[in-house]
Structures are given as structure tokens and as C-alpha cells.
């Protein structure tokens, strides 16, 4: 809306430190093609890894997958709390911010402008808020939906197995 860029495509895959760079390269290539893109369409990569053991493997996979017309790897930047995003990090310890929180906030500002709130329903549920001055005001982290459901099942054995999907009715 209003001339702002649109999110073209979004996909998530499970993080598995046992997978090789070749496995990630093939998986990412297939996912790109499934989304209607080619690795040749990629002109730069921002990697926001929250699994340090995977960062090198993913850099290797992406470096071999995403290459320019001359065959050289496209620019690849690993994002962290110290990466310049145009955001002011007004949190107690900016070094503790994970890459997914920083990239999510920066992407939300890029897509929707400010002020903006970001709610990420991943392994943890993360709420981040950016004000009109591009200041990341803070982050709230809680157990994710699957994590909470697994904990509930473990603590209350009589609760039946339910899938995480939209219910037909809010109560029932």
C-alpha cells in the first residue's frame, strides 16, 4: 500500500545442525524453484541464523547456490544485533538480540513503515515494537505455541492430543 514494497515470498525450514551444506543447498534451491524463482534471481543474501552451529554451513550452501551471471557468489551478509539496519536498539543489552528479532523488526519497518509491532509465532513467541523514530523499544519473549502445547501435554496427561490449527469455534 502507498508505494511500499511487497513481501514477495516467505518460507521456513527446520534447523538441523547434522545436515550438510549440500543438503541445505539442494533444499533451498528446490524451495526457490517451488516459489517460482531461480537461484539466478538472487542478487544478495542476508542470513539471520539463530543456530550458531549452522551459520557456517548455511553460508557455504548459500555461497554455492546463489551466484551472479559471472559465476561468483552474490554478496552475503550475516545479520546480528550489531548489523546496521537503520534501527536504534533501545534495549538493556543489544548484544543479546538474536538475528531473527533484528531482521524481523527491520523487515517490518521496510514493508510497513513506522510505528510497527512484530509478532513472530516461532519456537518462542516474540513481540517487538518499533516507534515512529525507528527505535526498537523492546522485545517480549514467551514460549511458542508448540512448545506450550508440548509442555501442557507433559504436565496434564488427560488433555487430549490436539493439532495446532484454527478451530471451527473459539469455544468448544
Model-derived regions: residue spans:
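Gly/Thr-rich phosphate-binding beta-strand-loop-beta motif of the actin/hexokinase/Hsp70
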Residues: 1-9, 108, 114-136, 152
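A mobile "lid/hinge" subdomain adjacent to the ATP/sugar-phosphate binding pocket shared
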Residues: 155-172
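Short, well-ordered alpha-helices that flank and scaffold nucleotide-derived cofactor binding pockets
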Residues: 30, 60, 64, 110, ...
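Conserved active-site and cofactor/substrate-binding residues in soluble primary-metabolism enzymes
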Residues: 19, 23-26, 49, 53, ...
Amino acid at each position: 500500500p502507498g508505494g511500499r514494497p511487497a513481501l514477495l515470498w516467505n518460507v521456513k525450514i527446520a534447523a538441523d545442525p547434522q545436515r550438510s551444506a549440500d543438503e541445505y543447498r539442494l533444499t533451498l534451491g528446490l524451495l526457490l524453484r517451488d516459489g517460482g524463482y531461480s537461484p539466478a534471481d538472487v542478487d544478495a543474501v542476508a542470513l539471520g541464523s539463530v543456530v550458531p552451529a549452522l551459520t557456517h554451513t548455511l553460508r557455504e550452501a548459500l555461497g554455492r547456490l546463489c551466484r551472479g551471471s559471472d559465476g561468483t557468489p552474490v554478496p552475503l551478509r550475516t545479520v546480528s544485533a550489531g548489523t546496521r539496519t537503520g534501527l536504534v536498539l533501545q534495549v538493556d543489552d543489544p548484544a543479546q538480540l538474536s538475528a531473527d528479532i533484528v531482521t524481523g523488526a527491520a523487515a517490518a519497518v521496510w514493508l510497513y513503515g513506522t510505528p510497527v509491532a512484530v509478532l513472530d509465532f516461532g519456537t518462542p513467541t516474540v513481540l517487538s515494537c518499533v516507534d515512529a523514530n525507528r527505535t526498537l523499544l523492546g522485545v517480549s519473549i514467551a514460549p511458542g505455541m508448540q512448545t506450550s502445547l508440548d509442555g501442557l501435554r507433559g504436565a496434564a496427561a488427560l488433555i487430549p492430543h490436539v493439532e495446532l490449527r484454527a478451530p471451527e469455534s473459539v469455544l468448544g
